[in-house]
């Protein structure tokens, strides 16, 4: 059923009109940067159902409020990104007491809360888009372990991500692709890691002045032999929705459909993005 939904989504988006470099409610990174001296602030709320956390053994529904991202345009081709969430609330519907770190859980009842891990990254646009070629960029990011093992929401690992970003407007369609490598720490052993391939493909089309419909498939694939360390296996989700831009503010909403047992069976996301001039580059 989920592959059919994805096929319908991608076919529908191929009717497109011009769309600008995209982000919320998607997570596939456009190679275009926000611009020198500009600041981008995005915030939103996610509600995701039937998530499985294999390290803590918890299954349930996750509320992320608010999700926050801030980007600083430090030059015409580079930006610094900071992303995270101030408050995560996980409503537990099932537990696996034999999960690797279930013995560390320290909360009462069927609800746990906590911060989310912080991600700090840098994006560089290497090649600008031209009529005969796509824009090409690179992104490097590090995930810092702010979420705790005791809440069941954190892995306690520091991860590194790097990806090649490609984007092209073809006639009226904005197509963005990501491909890269993530080095994920083993939450049960400090001397082990797992390398996974990351991927993303997004499309965007305008249906009216300042109104777009968007969609993507994004995730990661374990490339190793045997069972991966807990919490480092395959992930994936389809996202589709819309966004409305008025001046320097964009409002968005979307639907999330997970592709693996660890991802949500269904989710909703909504938020806004605001871009303004924050400083002058000397």
Regions found by a protein language model. Name each.
Residues 21-282:
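Transmembrane beta-barrel domains of Gram-negative outer membranes and organellar outer membranes
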Residues 16-18:
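N-terminal signal peptide c-region/cleavage motif recognized by signal peptidases
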Residues 1-6:
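Bacterial N-terminal signal peptides that target proteins for export
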């Amino acid at each position: 059923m989920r592959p059919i939904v994805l096929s319908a989504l991608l076919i529908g988006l191929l009717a497109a009109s011009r769309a600008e470099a995209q982000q919320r409610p998607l997570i596939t990174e456009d190679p275009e940067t926000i611009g020198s001296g500009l600041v981008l602030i995005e915030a939103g709320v996610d509600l995701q159902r039937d998530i499985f956390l294999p390290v803590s053994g918890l299954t349930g529904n996750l509320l992320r409020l608010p999700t926050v991202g801030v980007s600083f345009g430090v030059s015409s081709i580079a930006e610094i990104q900071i992303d995270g969430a101030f408050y995560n609330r996980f409503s537990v519907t099932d537990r696996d007491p034999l999960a690797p770190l279930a013995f560390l859980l320290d909360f009462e009842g069927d609800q746990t809360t906590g911060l989310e891990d912080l991600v700090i990254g840098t994006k560089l646009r290497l090649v600008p888009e031209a009529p005969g070629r796509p824009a090409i960029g690179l992104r490097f990011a590090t995930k810092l372990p702010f979420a705790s093992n005791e809440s069941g929401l954190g892995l306690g690992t520091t991860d590194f991500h790097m990806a090649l970003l490609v984007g092209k407007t073809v006639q009226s369609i904005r197509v963005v692709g990501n491909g890269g490598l993530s080095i994920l720490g083993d939450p049960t052993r400090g001397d082990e890691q797992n390398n996974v391939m990351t991927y993303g493909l997004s499309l965007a089309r305008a249906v009216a002045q300042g109104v777009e419909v968007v969609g993507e498939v994004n995730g990661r694939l374990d490339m190793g032999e045997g069972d991966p360390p807990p919490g480092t296996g395959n992930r994936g989700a389809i996202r589709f929705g819309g966004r409305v831009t008025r001046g320097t503010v964009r409002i968005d909403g979307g639907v999330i459909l997970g592709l693996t047992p660890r991802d949500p069976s269904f989710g909703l996301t909504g938020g806004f993005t605001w871009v303004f001039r924050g400083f002058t580059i000397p």
